[in-house]
């Protein structure tokens, strides 16, 4: 049986192959200024991911509006089984692999699976890994994460390899929304090298310079959220840095 990859994932893979990296903007549906944020980022992001760690209100309405405003692929990033709507294009179908609670490893995605099928949403199979200092953030608390220490990059690498063996095509290395510092470069590089699948990096990425480093280290996708909420104009410079790094990375790889 041939594995079917949907339209959204195919488009994202195309961007990564041709431009070296993609830029996702995370919009919390509970954010009061989501319309303003959506209007600004529509010319810079490659996709919008929609989700939050704690209770979501009016997800259908917000997702539909964001999709209409941006015209970009809208991908759900569900914090729980209630974080799914038929108004989106796709969903990050994920396992929080290093949670201490099996609910977040397997039960939550299993409970949401039938709804996803009913809505006809495209799924992007993904391992979600909580990296230090995620325990100090909302997702770390809610998800009961046994965070991976930054000084042990090989642990993230092994988890990423395991994810690839499970058939997942994406790994999200997450330091947490508003994290004090981002996932380190060595961890990103090892995770990419061992798994060979798409690596998403988010949390604590506040400057274009840091985003550039992460892409050059092996990240295929950079996610910003809190930064976008505080300074929507920052996304323009962030995109420039990510795309420059992507092309520089492709040139570097072509010489090997």
Swiss-Prot record:
* NCBIfam families (UniProt xref): GGGP, GGGP-family, PRK04169.1-2, PRK04169.1-5
Function of the protein = Prenyltransferase that catalyzes the transfer of the geranylgeranyl moiety of geranylgeranyl diphosphate (GGPP) to the C3 hydroxyl of sn-glycerol-1-phosphate (G1P). This reaction is the first ether-bond-formation step in the biosynthesis of archaeal membrane lipids.
Q: Organism classification, top ranks?
A: Archaea, Methanobacteriati, Methanobacteriota, Methanomada group, Methanococci
This chain's protein is named Geranylgeranylglyceryl phosphate synthase
Taking the first listed entry, what is the main subcellular location of this protein, grouped into a coarse class?
cytoplasm
Recorded hits in InterPro entries, A to Z, give: GGGP/HepGP_synthase_sf, GGGP_HepGP_synthase, GGGP_synth, IGPS_HisA/HisF
Q: Which GO terms describe its molecular function?
A: imidazoleglycerol-phosphate synthase activity; magnesium ion binding; phosphoglycerol geranylgeranyltransferase activity
The residues listed in the UniProt record as binding Mg(2+), with positions renumbered to this chain, are 28, 53
The annotated pathway is:
Membrane lipid metabolism; glycerophospholipid metabolism
């Amino acid at each position: 049986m041939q594995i079917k990859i949907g339209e959204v994932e195919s488009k994202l893979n195309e961007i990564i192959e041709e431009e070296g990296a993609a830029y996702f903007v995370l919009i919390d549906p509970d954010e009061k200024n989501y319309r303003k944020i959506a209007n600004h980022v529509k010319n810079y992001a490659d996709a919008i991911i929609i989700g939050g760690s704690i209770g979501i209100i009016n997800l259908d309405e917000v997702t539909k509006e964001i999709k209409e405003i941006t015209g970009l692929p809208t991908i759900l990033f569900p914090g729980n089984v209630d974080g799914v709507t038929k108004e989106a294009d796709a969903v990050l179908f994920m396992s929080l692999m290093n949670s201490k609670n099996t609910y977040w490893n397997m039960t939550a995605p299993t409970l949401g699976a039938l709804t996803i099928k009913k809505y006809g949403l495209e799924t992007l199979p993904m391992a979600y890994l909580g990296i230090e200092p995620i325990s100090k953030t909302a997702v770390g608390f809610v998800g009961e994460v046994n965070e991976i220490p930054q000084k042990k990059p090989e642990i993230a690498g092994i988890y990423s390899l395991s994810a690839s063996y499970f058939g997942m095509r994406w790994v999200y290395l997450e330091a947490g929304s508003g994290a004090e510092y981002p996932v380190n470069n060595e961890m990103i590089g090892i995770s990419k090298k061992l798994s060979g699948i798409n690596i998403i990096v988010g949390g604590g990425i506040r400057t274009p310079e840091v985003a550039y480093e992460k892409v050059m280290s092996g990240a295929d996708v950079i996610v910003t959220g809190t930064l976008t909420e505080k300074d929507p104009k920052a996304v323009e410079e962030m995109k420039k840095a990510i795309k420059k790094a992507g092309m520089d990375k492709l040139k570097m790889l072509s010489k090997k």
